[in-house]
């Protein structure tokens, strides 16, 4: 509600005022606190627009309870940051160039140790596997499981690494761990790996599978929240059957993307700099703008240094 938002905003504005004071006492420009809020507001706007494009639910509310107010024009934000200007000395350090140099080569997004998402594919160097998800699906990499699900979030397939007894065949493992009768049982043999898949009847029914890779076992569970399993079962099976060891040429894909600095040349466009990014070109351009404080419609000037992800 607006009442709760207002209460929360008072607390956040107090924190912003303190942040501005800390900046001033450390020798930095205290008004940079407003720039920080602007960046966070832009991030929220971008996330909303991205959700709307993908047919996902758009989160209500606004950062700091700002509603539709832009941080640069927000009177109360200016008021809490203003007093910190009295604490600022004459040497208000910015140090943007030094900061940017420290960013060169920094990993961006997924890490090699946790696995890397690239488009509809997932790569894990240490565990030596890859698998693919249907077009339009999201991939969520959690510490305990890897999840894939469509835009409507009404179904999902999860995969996790589980302990297993090497004396059990994949079929025996699945029967032992399913805890009930299996249906539509089928052996899996893919890329030199052995596995087994079946359906666990019930409400809801579940597609389950296990794949052995060396001394590791990967358990898959696919569920449709509302409706029959058949509506997504072919897609669940496509994910399961895509699991395989990495090829040599794919090992580079299992390494994280990194930030790099590029200097804009005369005539060079954001579209050119964003080419080859994830998703559509328009999405890549929007992300590039967001990364460089140009969102939603800013353009770089020749000679500007921009952060790009490669």
Regions found by a protein language model. Name each.
Residues 13, 132, 265, 295, ...:
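Residue-level recognition of short, solvent-exposed, well-ordered loop/turn junctions
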Residues 87, 220-256:
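Surface-exposed amphipathic alpha-helical segments
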Residues 248-279, 304:
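Primarily a LysM-type cell-wall glycan-binding module
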Residues 150-161, 257-266, 306-309:
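Short, surface-exposed polybasic-and-hydrophobic patches located at secondary-structure transitions
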Residues 1-95, 100-104, 108-133, 138, ...:
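A Zn2+-metalloprotease active-site environment signal
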Residues 282-310:
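Extracellular LysM carbohydrate-binding repeats and other cell-envelope/extracellular binding modules
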Residues 158, 174-223:
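Signature of long, low-cysteine stretches enriched in small and polar/charged residues
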């Amino acid at each position: 509600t607006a009442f709760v938002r207002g209460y929360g905003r008072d607390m956040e504005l107090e924190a912003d005022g303190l942040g501005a004071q800390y900046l001033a006492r450390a020798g930095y420009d205290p008004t940079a606190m407003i720039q920080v809020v602007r960046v966070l507001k832009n991030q929220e706007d971008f996330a909303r627009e991205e959700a709307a494009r993908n047919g996902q639910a758009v989160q209500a509310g606004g950062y700091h309870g700002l509603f539709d107010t832009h941080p640069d024009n927000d009177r109360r934000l200016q008021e809490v940051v203003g007093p910190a200007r009295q604490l600022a000395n004459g040497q208000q350090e910015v140090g943007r160039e030094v900061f940017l140099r420290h960013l060169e080569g920094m990993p961006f997004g997924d890490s090699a140790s946790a696995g890397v998402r690239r488009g509809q594919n997932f790569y894990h160097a240490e565990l030596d596997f890859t698998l693919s998800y249907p077009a339009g699906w999201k991939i969520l990499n959690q510490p305990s499981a890897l999840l894939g699900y469509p835009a409507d979030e009404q179904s999902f397939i999860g995969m996790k690494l589980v302990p297993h007894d090497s004396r059990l065949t994949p079929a025996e493992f699945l029967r032992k761990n399913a805890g009930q009768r299996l249906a539509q049982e089928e052996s899996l043999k893919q890329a030199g790996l052995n596995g087994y898949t079946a359906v666990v009847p019930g409400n809801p029914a579940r597609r389950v599978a296990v794949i052995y890779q060396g001394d590791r076992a990967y358990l898959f569970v696919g569920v449709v929240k509302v409706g029959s399993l058949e509506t997504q079962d072919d897609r669940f099976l496509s994910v399961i059957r895509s699991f395989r060891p990495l090829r040599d040429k794919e090992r580079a894909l299992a390494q994280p993307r990194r930030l790099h600095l590029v200097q804009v040349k005369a005539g060079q466009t954001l579209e050119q700099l964003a080419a080859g990014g994830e998703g559509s070109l328009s999405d890549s351009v929007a992300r590039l703008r967001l990364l460089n404080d140009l969102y939603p419609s800013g353009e770089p000037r020749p000679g500007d240094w921009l952060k790009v992800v490669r």
